[in-house]
Amino acid sequence: MLSLYLPEKKDLWFRRAMLADAQTMAYNRAWGGVIAFPEEDWADWYAYWIACPEGKRFYRYLKAESGDFVGEIAYHFDASLGGFAADVIVFAPYRGRGSGAEGLELLCAAAKENGVSVLYDDIAADNPAIALFLSRGFVEESRTADKIILRINL
């Protein structure tokens, strides 16, 4: 069973490790793959996402009963979608154990608790996570050759 963990700045080593891992970030290959997250960027990122979310952002780590961080969940207001966009990333070594489904359920519950009524996700058309989102109640809103927009009413 996973729990949500509000990371401290010192915990951002885990986010850096996930974003630098090619297997974890394979879903992002359409947008460049791995993402640099150097320590000098942590303070600004933390201020924006954690310290001052302004009702527009939510971010948590997924934490296993063992105490290991296994992924992240987040949502943020995306003007191009006209609503809140979901984010679920499970660190590759922890995939295949139901963490993505559990993380998505935790994200939807947190968003609903925070007054969000609809969540969207734009997913690369070749991303196998589409099946996960559809199995959890998301529906296809629109599609292009490159991506699919999914939506769930909370």
Question: What do these predicted regions represent?
Answer:
Residues 1-39, 43:
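A short, well-structured alpha-helix characteristic of acyl/acetyltransferase catalytic modules
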Residues 14, 85, 89, 102-103, ...:
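Amphipathic alpha-helical recognition patches that constitute DNA-binding helices
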Residues 35-85, 91-93, 144:
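Acetyl-CoA-dependent GNAT
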Residues 91, 110, 120-131:
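Conserved beta-strand-loop-alpha-helix junction that forms the acyl-donor binding cleft
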Residues 96-110, 130-131, 135:
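Conserved acetyl-CoA-binding loop-helix of GNAT-fold acetyltransferases
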Residues 120-124, 139-152:
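Conserved catalytic-core motifs of GNAT/GCN5-like acyltransferases
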